[in-house]
Curated annotation (Swiss-Prot):
Substrate binds at residues 38, 52, 64, 167. Mg(2+) 1 binds at residues 92, 97, 130. It is an enzyme of class 3 (hydrolase). The keyword Oxidoreductase does not apply. It is found in: Cytoplasm. NCBIfam families: PRK00642.1 (NF001886). This is Inorganic pyrophosphatase. It comes from the Bacteria.
């Protein structure tokens, strides 16, 4: 009997993103609030790698990762530019990022979970679209009933926005008030989040299929 080599599906290319028109999403988690190291999926191998230690006091306040079979390319960049009233905005060339809210103490990354999108944060990083979709863990006892970002506690959204505004900043740049490369254009709700996801999924299909 011949032996079949064992293989593991690539977290970016293997899982099915959605089976119900973006109401529920498969999410790959890279970072948890317990991590003092920034982990990142290696796009070539599909292995979770150390990107860099967290240099300063910033810790991601939520589960953070990516959406399988998404890519921030031309369609994503064009839409971000339209909504931001900016020209020449491009996609950042990465899978679409996702932040997952849960009251559970999940301390391990490199996992898949199901979450429902409730909105997103429109971010420009060096004039590239770098949106963060906000979602809630399915059946979560605290966040599970939230349907739209407008129902999310403001303090939670403030913490997430503060993290992404400052996690790349140095104390020197903050003290000297140097212009930030990262800009939060605004928040948007569930319906627009689903459109952002759909465009990123189309970008992925255009690139890989």
């Amino acid at each position: 009997m011949s032996k079949t080599p064992l293989s593991i599906a690539h977290p970016w290319h293997g899982p099915v993103l959605t089976r119900d028109d973006y109401e529920s999403l498969c999410c790959y988690i890279e970072i948890t609030p317990a991590d003092s190291v920034k982990f990142e999926l290696d796009k070539e191998t599909g292995i979770l790698k150390v990107d860099r230690p967290q240099k300063f006091s910033n810790f991601c306040p939520c589960l953070y990762g990516l959406l399988p079979k998404t890519y921030c390319g031309d369609l994503s960049g064009e839409y971000s530019g339209q909504q931001s009233n900016r020209e020449n905005i491009k996609g950042d060339g990465d899978p679409l990022d996702i932040c997952v809210l849960t009251e559970k103490n999940i301390t391990q990354g490199n996992i898949l979970l199901q979450a429902r999108p409730i909105g997103g944060i429109r971010i420009l990083d060096s004039e590239e679209a770098d949106d963060k979709i906000i979602a809630v863990l399915e059946d979560d006892l605290v966040y599970g009933n939230i349907e739209d970002i407008s129902e999310c506690p403001g303090t939670v959204l403030d913490m997430i926005q503060h993290y992404f505004l400052t996690y790349k900043a140095t104390p020197e740049s903050l003290i000297q008030a140097k212009p930030a490369k990262i800009e939060i254009v605004g928040l948007y709700g569930k319906k627009e989040a689903q459109k952002v996801i759909r465009l990123a999924h189309e970008d992925y299909c255009n690139l890989f299929m």
